[in-house]
A protein has these predicted regions:
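Short, structured secondary-structure elements
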Residues: 1-114, 121-129, 133-171
Length: 171
């Protein structure tokens, strides 16, 4: 019902994304983005990056990405910290390192606050705001590319859920 009503009300896309991820938003739907199994935090972070940033980070949950040097495990774990209530431990080949990665956004933006919220709900609210921030270089590109593909048959970059700085636009 939430998504249907949001479209019916002509709700802005960035507002819908904020409502989807931020538990403090007035129309917050069920938090289906956050999965319930033991790897919920890493899957939630990877899924959010893929859907809203066109960035596949699943590999970086366990190791540095093999063919995309842009995504290190450390960078992914910093992003995933927003889906937890604490900084996450860096795990190497399933071995604990006792090294915790500070929570941080995946892109440098002038508007990123330097403090990190302490509770999971506050962190979810922060990641929602960072995703839709006008200074975020990927958010608008991602939805435009998805719509371009939907209506014109091919995205400006392909595949639509794996934008890479080292891959030129398809046309």
């Amino acid at each position: 019902d939430w998504i249907y009503n949001s479209f019916k009300e002509n709700k802005a896309y960035d507002v819908m994304v904020a409502e989807l991820l931020d538990p403090h938003m007035p129309d917050h739907p069920l938090r289906f983005v956050l999965r319930q199994d033991h790897t919920r935090i890493l899957k939630s972070a990877a899924d959010t990056a893929q859907v809203f940033l066109a960035t596949q980070m699943k590999c970086a949950a366990c190791h540095n990405h093999f063919d995309n040097k842009e995504w290190s495990q450390r960078r992914f774990m910093g992003f995933a910290g927003y889906f937890s209530d604490k900084d996450l431990e860096l795990i190497k080949c399933e071995a604990r390192t006792n090294e915790f990665v500070p929570t941080g956004f995946v892109f440098d933006m002038p508007s990123i606050p330097t403090d990190v919220p302490q509770t999971e709900d506050e962190r979810a609210a922060r990641i929602a705001q960072l995703l839709i921030d006008p200074c975020n270089p990927r958010f608008a590109k991602t939805i435009v590319n998805r719509l371009w593909k939907r209506f014109l048959g091919m995205g400006l970059f392909e595949p639509v859920d794996n934008f890479r700085e080292d891959t030129p636009a398809s046309h």
